[in-house]
Amino acid sequence: MIGRMLGNRYEILEKIGEGGMAKVYKAKCHLLNRIVAIKILRPEFAADENFVKKFKRESQAAASLSHPNIVGIYDVGQEGDIYYIVMEYVKGRTLKELIRENGGPLEVKRAVEIASQVCRALDHAHKNKIIHRDIKPQNILVTDEDVVKVTDFGIARAANGATITYTGDVIGTAYYFSPEQAKGSIVDERTDIYSLGIVLFEMLTGKVPFEGDSPISVALKHIQEDILPPSRLNEKVPEELDKIVLKATQKDPNLRYQTASEFLKDLDTFLKNPKDLKFEEKDFEKTKVMPSREAEELKRAALKREREKKRKEIRKKVGIVLLVLLLLASLSYGTVYVLNNFFKVNDVVVPNVVGLSLSQASKVLSEHNLKMEISEERYSDKPENTILEQDPPQGALVKPGTTVYVVISKGRQMVIVPNVIGRDYLEAKNVLENAGLKVNIIENYNEQYQKGYVFDQNPRYGVQVEYGTTIDVYVSKGPKPSIVPNVVNMNLDEAKASLESAGLTLGKVIYKEADNVPENTVLEQSVPPDTEVQKGSPIDLIVSKLPQNSLQQQTKNVIINLPNKDGPMKVEVYVIQDGQKNLVYSGEHTSSDSPLTVPVTAHKGKAVIEVDIDGQVYSRVEARF
């Protein structure tokens, strides 16, 4: 796998880890020139069509999550029989490694801070209707800067959904199971709260609350046994923190924190002032031991394969007996008739339930002595819980009690629009498409964002929209350029004003003798009219002056002592004569150019010479020409 290129984009560099369902590699994205992590499904899962469908759907949903405490999912892809997720590459280690390296409990404050960051991640995910189902230290990364990032949202959800629907087994780590997970029941967001409570217990004590010889024995303890307060194992744990852990790990989900934000609020309060925490007695009712019937169900699940094996042996023996009976029955037509009527069971015609609601379909099938089981939930434009498909189909002949498997609608898939403002447009497009959204790129000028970066989006981020909605993404073309105006034949003052109104500056002014043209008239400009240039660009001008042999004009050299300033300064020289003020020189200089000599031409007689520096009057002197 090392050196392989996936999707003509991701080059596999090295293996950095592996788990029960996938292997993780460090890779380079050649499109965006960045390092990423790629999780590749193990072949045994990639070969399971139902698992792959669930995996794709849930990974794409998880890709819509955008939060600093969640490992970002950039891409979900397939190449042949390889299914992979492209994720944010996190420099750091897992929380499990951190606990092992510490050789015992973490410092109390640090443990609570880590749990708080995980809570923030769960709160964001739960608000987006995504449950993790496999919160454990191995799925919590801690960066070198102590930023916590939760990973494996997509793969955990896909595994859980697939196994509940298709096998009845429970995938996950038994040490962190909630009681409802251990029983294989339907779970909600509170299962993550329980698991995080177990993780917090481990951070505070250096060990998990329950251990056993097998996953089943550990799962039974989660169902039946009380969790000790962490302070029993670590005297540094305050009583208030004991109560937080015990509330999060109540057997009854209704007695736990009901949301991650509730859990987070108590953790933050503990960090600020533990005495402000308020708990009610009902929060800590004695753990109710689950009925032995439910415990037995869990035990029986472990013996399921053994029973299946025995059933096969019984079926084999029954088959032999039936074969003997049929051979005997063939002795006469009358015997066959008797046996047929004795063993005959009337077949049932499967009714149509497609288009019905779940409750309606259940009633119809029950009336026909048939059972119903949900095989898949799928997003569609049909109302929630509407039957989309059935198997066996309408009209099929089946035995009474046969199970009809149905696919039901989850309604229209809704997604939260992620924030892509400030991202490179290729990255923004990838994030939105991974969230199941379409992208419409609109390019426009923008003064604040550099070319190629997103400066706006519509709908805005955080809005809930239907899966497949098109998002308008506004990409910057950079600052809007200025159009160079035509200033030829204008006098110099008019030309300067025209350039400034267009967002441009007057550059160098070069004087050229010209006959039959008024003095200070623009003869040429350095950039042609209607040309697009960057805002603030200087435009040089060639301006007319009277010929040297003119008896009406005289030229004198004006010596200017420039001020001592850092950087360049703009020097402009004006001649004020006969009630008119004319610009006769403009240029940029530094203090090192001092003294500056400027030739000034004026009509015979008195004139005032004004020197402006950076737009401010610097000096005025009267001269005679």
UniProtKB/Swiss-Prot annotation:
Nucleus listed as a keyword: no
Domain Protein kinase residue range list: 10-271
Keywords associated with the record: ATP-binding, Kinase, Nucleotide-binding, Repeat, Serine/threonine-protein kinase, Transferase
InterPro entries: Kinase-like_dom_sf, PASTA_dom, Prot_kinase_dom, Protein_kinase_ATP_BS, Ser/Thr_kinase_AS
Family matches, as Pfam families: PASTA (PF03793), Pkinase (PF00069)
SMART domains per the UniProt record, alphabetical: PASTA, S_TKc
Catalytic activity annotation: L-seryl-[protein] + ATP = O-phospho-L-seryl-[protein] + ADP + H(+); L-threonyl-[protein] + ATP = O-phospho-L-threonyl-[protein] + ADP + H(+)
A GO term for molecular function: protein serine/threonine kinase activity
UniProt-annotated binding residues for ATP: 16-24, 39
EC number(s) stated in the UniProt entry for this protein: 2.7.11.1
Similarity comment: family membership: Belongs to the protein kinase superfamily. Ser/Thr protein kinase family.
Protein name (database record): Probable serine/threonine-protein kinase Sps1
Species of provenance: Caldanaerobacter subterraneus subsp. tengcongensis (strain DSM 15242 / JCM 11007 / NBRC 100824 / MB4)
